């Protein structure tokens, strides 16, 4: 057998022998960006820079010409993401479950309040994104960091 045929067989063998199928989020980047005014953009793509560009473009379409779309982004693969707005302070967090993402956002909110903004306004959920990149209606609208910190 020639060397090229051997290499081809070695390359194809794992695919033929029953490698598990890829899930959509195994190779899709999901990006979230939020502005200080609450406008946001979400996009998914197999290439991270493309997902970033699409999310910023969608944010700008929502926000209008004067905005800070792209100033703060989060990119993840297969994670839940939540974006909260606390006055004009943005918090974007991710986690393997919705509860983990919400917990991470709450931890960031508490840290922000303890170390940088003692009079941090109550946070409001701006957008929730599931592991496939779909936007999910949120039933949690306001944070409870003030109660958790007491």
Q: For each of these PLM feature ranges, what is it?
A:
Residues 1-7:
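Positively charged n-region of N-terminal signal peptides that target proteins for export
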Residues 8-19:
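Bacterial N-terminal signal peptides
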Residues 22-150:
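Secreted/extracellular ectodomain signature
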């Amino acid at each position: 057998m020639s060397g090229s045929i051997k290499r081809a067989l070695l390359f194809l063998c794992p695919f033929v022998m029953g490698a598990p199928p890829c899930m959509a989020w195994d190779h899709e980047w999901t990006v979230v960006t939020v502005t200080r005014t609450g406008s946001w953009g979400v996009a998914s793509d197999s290439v991270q820079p493309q997902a970033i560009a699409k999310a910023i473009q969608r944010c700008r379409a929502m926000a209008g010409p004067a905005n800070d779309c792209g100033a703060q982004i989060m990119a993840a693969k297969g994670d839940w993401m939540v974006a909260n707005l606390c006055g004009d302070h943005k918090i974007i967090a991710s986690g393997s479950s919705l509860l983990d993402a919400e917990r991470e956002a709450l931890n960031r909110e508490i840290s922000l309040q303890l170390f940088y903004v003692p009079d941090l306004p109550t946070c409001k959920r701006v957008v929730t994104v599931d592991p496939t990149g779909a936007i999910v209606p949120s039933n949690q609208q306001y944070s409870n960091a003030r109660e958790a910190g007491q």
